[in-house]
Regions:
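Short alpha-helix
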Residues: 344, 369-384
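Conserved beta-strand signature within the Rossmann-like core of class I S-adenosyl-L-methionine
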Residues: 355-363
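Class I S-adenosyl-L-methionine
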Residues: 378-424
Length: 425
């Protein structure tokens, strides 16, 4: 999977995964003791984490070391102090998590920490990142029914929350009392919502869509932001099959933000059918296609992979790492067992017109991390009754590729992303 900008709970351009919608009646609740009174509220977690079993009320008097100890033990801290101080406390928790261990705390067998096996190193990195996220998600913020945060110096996040979670509950009364909550969310999630709100507002300029300023994709909350332009450039520049040039239909499987469909439409493709299973992604794609003025060329359909019919070209950019997501947040990054990749390959031949092609956009990062071999990929292509017609390669230019402090630097710095041209064998 690419190291593109990451909105919370993303559906990637290429991911066709959706869960059941959560309603106030089905959402989990978080409970705490407010003095002598027991209280509870709707629990919101974009990681899909259960609410903390134990929650303490906290305010500005809480020391960072004490908060860190509670958070590491899985105790939620429901903040009722100054909002800016909550942000400072979250930063203090981050510093403690990111602090190198003292020498006396380091394992005796240091070889167990740094492994030469890239798959082992990757799994340890994921475990460390998961633990970090769990600890940081223990600092909780109460929200009113209209998404207002009734804390001192709290910003107005109502519009950002509505974009992320949908309309506020108009039936429930709001209150100025910060101790009363209609719902509770980790501060970390709220800051992610703010970041996503800003990304959506300003958009992401992508040269593959043409010259500025009419080349921006506006990712909605929960939809992956396509910041890695190198794979988009391949789609913008690869020769189109003759069947497309004579008016054939193109399928974009797992459209996400709609960026690949838009790139193809900007290339002059007259008819693109773009699919995704996730409602957030389809709404995002519709918005972007409208902004870019190509909505007449692209038809959006809610589908798990393929729509009906056949196409002259089928484009798919699935999640690149075939491992199990640890949370809904990771569905854009990880695809357990390569379900989407295999689904695309196994359905391709049946959905191509004569002389049609499939374009698979895939990084070899999984191979470099020991999660899949090149031979396994080629075997899957052959088993689907396909052959490789050609391949275009590109190399990453994103920050992580040059970050020597990244635990996965060796794999990321050598990563190659390819556009595989596939056809029936």
């Amino acid at each position: 999977m690419s190291a593109e900008s990451f909105n919370p709970s993303p559906t990637r351009s290429g991911a066709a995964t959706a869960g059941a919608a959560e309603t106030p009646d089905t959402a989990p609740v978080v409970a705490w003791q407010q003095g002598a009174t027991s209280q509870q509220a709707r629990w919101r977690s974009e990681r899909g984490s259960p609410p903390p079993a134990r929650v303490l009320v906290a305010d500005d008097t809480l020391a960072a070391n004490t908060a860190y100890q509670h958070a590491c033990e899985g105790t939620g801290l429901l903040w009722q102090g100054d909002f800016n101080n909550a942000r400072h406390l979250l930063q203090a928790l981050m510093r403690r998590l990111d602090r190198p261990p003292r020498r006396q705390d380091a394992p005796k067998n240091e070889g167990a920490v740094v492994s030469a096996d890239p798959a082992v190193a990757f799994n340890r990195h994921r475990q460390a990142q998961g633990q970090r996220a769990r600890v940081l998600s223990m600092l909780l913020i109460p929200l009113q029914s209209n998404y207002r945060i009734a804390l001192r110096r709290a910003p107005d996040l109502r519009l950002a929350c509505e974009q992320a979670w949908g309309p506020a509950d108009a039936q429930a009364p709001a209150t100025e009392d910060g101790r009363v909550a209609h719902s509770v969310a980790p501060l970390r999630d709220l800051l992610g919502i703010v970041s996503a709100f800003e990304w959506r507002k300003k958009g992401v300029p992508l040269p593959a869509l043409g010259p500025a300023p009419d080349n921006r994709i506006h990712p909605h909350y929960g939809v992956f932001s396509p910041l890695r332009g190198e794979y988009l450039d391949m789609v913008a520049q690869a020769p189109l099959p003759a069947a497309v040039q004579t008016g054939g239909v193109v399928f974009d499987i797992g459209t996400g933000t709609g960026v690949l469909a838009a790139v193809l439409a900007r290339r002059g493709v007259a008819q693109v059918v773009a699919t995704d299973l996730d409602a957030r992604a389809l709404a995002c794609a519709a918005d972007n296609l409208q902004r870019l003025g190509v909505q007449q060329q692209v038809q959006l359909k809610q589908a798990d992979l393929y729509p009906g019919g056949r196409a002259a070209l089928v484009v798919c950019n699935p999640p690149w790492l075939p491992v199990r997501p640890g949370s809904p947040l990771e569905r854009a990054v990880y695809d357990e067992g390569g379900r989407m990749l295999l689904g695309f390959l196994n359905g391709l031949a049946a959905h191509l017109v004569p002389d049609g092609e499939g374009w698979l956009i895939l990084s070899d990062l999984a191979e470099r991390l020991g999660l899949r071999t090149r031979q396994q990929l080629l075997d899957a292509v052959a088993a689907a009754g396909l052959q490789v017609l050609g391949r275009i390669d590109t190399w990453p230019t994103h920050r992580k590729a040059a970050d020597a402090s990244d635990p996965l630097h060796a794999a990321r710095s050598a990563e190659v992303t390819s556009l595989w041209r596939l056809g029936p064998a």
